[in-house]
């Protein structure tokens, strides 16, 4: 039977206590500002919040969970159903360094204005997006995002992040690792 012919699960009654494990209230979500190679850089300060999924990636240590080691251990809704959902919360001028994923990564601003960038060097591109706009990056595309909201320097804004797969992998670009090394050398 092909995927197109696959039968739907039989409908059953879901008790409230069962469904309560699949409900997350934004006000109760907990995130982390640690767990990624660029977490300590001042321009990368951000809180990542794991709502659904983000199992730790399997395999080599050069790959990290897109939401960081801390967050991959604490989803609000602990399911593995082919996608992951989280939020990034940060102030203007903040966001991750360029990185890549092994699956699709889609962004949708909830609040504020965000710049989504892709490629490095001569091929660099970007687009500015606002609430409910959507940018969907394919695997193998170096990408990053940054809060660019004006006139609110101390206000954290929220970006929705959806990433395909059960245990997606992220890897920072060589240029990003050079910036991390430079920062670490200056801290020594």
Mark where each language-model region is.
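A short, N-terminal "cap"/entry segment at the start of jelly-roll beta-barrel domains
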Residues: 1-81, 188
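Short histidine-centered beta-strand/loop micro-motifs
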Residues: 74-78, 96-101, 118, 126-128, ...
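Conserved short histidine dyad/triad with adjacent acidic residue
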Residues: 66-73, 84-101, 139
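Double-stranded beta-helix
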Residues: 2-18, 142-188
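Short acidic-glycine-tyrosine-enriched beta hairpin
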Residues: 108, 120-139
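A structural connector/turn signal
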Residues: 85, 95, 104, 124, ...
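Glycine- and acidic-residue-biased ligand/ion/polar-headgroup-sensing regions
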Residues: 92, 103-115, 120
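Histidine-centered metal-chelating micro-motifs
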Residues: 94-97, 115, 133-135, 139-145
């Amino acid at each position: 039977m092909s995927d197109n012919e696959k039968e739907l699960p039989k409908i059953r009654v879901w008790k409230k206590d069962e469904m309560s494990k699949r409900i997350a209230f934004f006000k109760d979500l907990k995130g982390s500002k640690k767990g990624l190679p660029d977490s300590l850089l001042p321009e990368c300060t951000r809180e990542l919040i794991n709502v659904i999924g983000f199992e730790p990636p399997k395999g080599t240590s050069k790959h990290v969970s897109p939401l960081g080691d801390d967050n991959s251990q604490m989803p609000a809704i602990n399911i593995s159903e082919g996608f992951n959902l989280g939020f990034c919360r940060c102030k203007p001028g903040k966001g991750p360094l360029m990185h890549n994923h092994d699956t699709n990564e889609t962004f949708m601003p909830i609040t504020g204005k965000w710049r989504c960038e892709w490629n490095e060097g001569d091929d660099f591109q970007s687009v500015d997006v606002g609430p409910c706009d959507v940018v969907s990056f394919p695997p193998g595309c170096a990408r990053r995002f940054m809060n660019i909201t004006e006139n609110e320097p101390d206000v954290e804004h929220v970006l929705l992040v959806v990433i395909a797969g059960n245990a997606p992998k992220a890897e920072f670009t060589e240029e990003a690792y050079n910036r991390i090394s430079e920062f670490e050398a200056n801290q020594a």
